[in-house]
């Protein structure tokens, strides 16, 4: 498969992040900032900012927040043809609590992106994509779970499939056995799997092997990342920065990882890891989930030039 100059499509949740301005419990916080969010949307924006054609397939409500999200994606040069408006369900909203080392989330599930059906899928986008990216959140409810899994199974072998574990246990409360089955199936379908160190430990304790058929990327927080291809394991140290907001760091990492796979000749794990770590670190210097730095900001770094420079 010739990946150069291809398009990366993401499928899944597009929502509003309401991020607490001050640290503390949600019940005590008074002020929130509105930001666009949803892991696949964050990745789609990151891919576009890194100079690669990017599309998002999702569903929002026919409401002001839905309009806002589509407008913001368009400003980021993300193809929005795959975003459908739901006449019955509202646009998703997530409250983000900044407390301690990493944010926590309060997410509601009776929303538009969990109501995706096969009739909502733009197959022109799916068939054009060299890489199709999805995560676990969209799989937590039907009909979206069935829809996304059918899409992924249909394109298996014709496009690279990337899966971000992105585990949100609260969403699966009362259906833990089903969650394990869904995650295991998704991992087995994926060529590229990304997970945090904590997610890997959790799933391995449940008997699930976290391994992409082509590449496995494990984020290690302040320690950097571990990339695994077949029997080759490369640990790549992180960049030392003072984080302002880590909300979108994992998604920035994923965007950089996918762009690197698309652009690098041969899968150079060290170059790929350095680039993804750099992008993730710089993303923590901005507030909000759409914090991936732009290509022109990155070209002053050798690690970025090795991937992004023509």
UniProtKB/Swiss-Prot annotation:
Keywords: ATP-binding, Kinase, Nucleotide-binding, Transferase
Disulfide-linked positions: none
Keyword Kinase: yes
Pfam families noted in UniProt: PfkB (PF00294)
InterPro entries per the UniProt record, alphabetical: Carboh/pur_kinase_PfkB_CS, PfkB_Carbo_kinase, PfkB_dom, Ribo/fructo_kinase, Ribokinase-like
Protein EC: 2.7.1.-
PANTHER family: HEXOKINASE FAMILY MEMBER, PSEUDOURIDINE KINASE-RELATED
MF annotations from Gene Ontology: ATP binding; fructokinase activity
Family under the similarity heading: Belongs to the carbohydrate kinase PfkB family.
GO BP term (any one): fructose metabolic process
Keyword Membrane set for record: no
Protein name per the record: Putative sugar kinase PH1459
Amino-acid positions noted as binding ATP in the UniProt annotation, renumbered to this chain: 194, 219, 224
SUPFAM superfamilies in UniProt: Ribokinase-like
């Amino acid at each position: 498969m010739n990946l150069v100059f291809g398009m990366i499509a993401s499928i899944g949740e597009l929502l509003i992040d309401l991020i607490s301005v001050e640290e503390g419990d949600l019940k005590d916080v008074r002020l929130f900032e509105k930001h666009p969010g949803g892991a696949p949307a964050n990745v789609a924006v990151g891919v576009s900012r890194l100079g690669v054609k990017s599309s998002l397939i999702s569903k929002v409500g026919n409401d002001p927040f839905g309009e806002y999200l589509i407008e913001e994606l368009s400003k980021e040069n993300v193809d929005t043809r795959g975003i459908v408006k739901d006449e019955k369900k509202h646009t998703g909203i997530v409250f983000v609590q900044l407390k301690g080392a990493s944010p926590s989330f309060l997410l509601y599930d009776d929303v538009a992106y969990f109501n995706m059906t096969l009739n909502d899928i733009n197959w022109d986008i799916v068939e054009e994509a060299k890489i199709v990216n999805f995560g676990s959140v969209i799989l937590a409810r039907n009909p979206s779970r069935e829809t996304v899994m059918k899409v992924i199974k249909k394109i298996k072998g014709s496009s690279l499939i990337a899966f971000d574990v992105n585990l949100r246990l609260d969403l699966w409360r009362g259906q833990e056995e089903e969650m394990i089955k869904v995650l295991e199936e998704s991992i087995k379908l994926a060529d590229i799997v990304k997970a945090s160190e904590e997610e890997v430990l959790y799933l391995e304790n449940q008997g699930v092997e976290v391994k992409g058929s082509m590449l496995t990327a494990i984020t290690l927080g302040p320690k950097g990342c571990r990339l695994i291809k077949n029997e080759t394991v490369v640990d790549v140290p992180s960049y030392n920065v003072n984080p302002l907001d880590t909300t979108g760091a994992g998604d920035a990492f994923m965007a950089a990882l996918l762009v690197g796979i698309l652009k690098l000749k041969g899968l150079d794990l060290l170059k790929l890891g350095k680039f993804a770590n750099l992008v993730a670190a710089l993303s923590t210097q901005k507030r909000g989930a759409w914090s991936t730095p732009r290509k022109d900001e990155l070209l002053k770094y050798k690690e970025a030039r090795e991937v992004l420079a023509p």
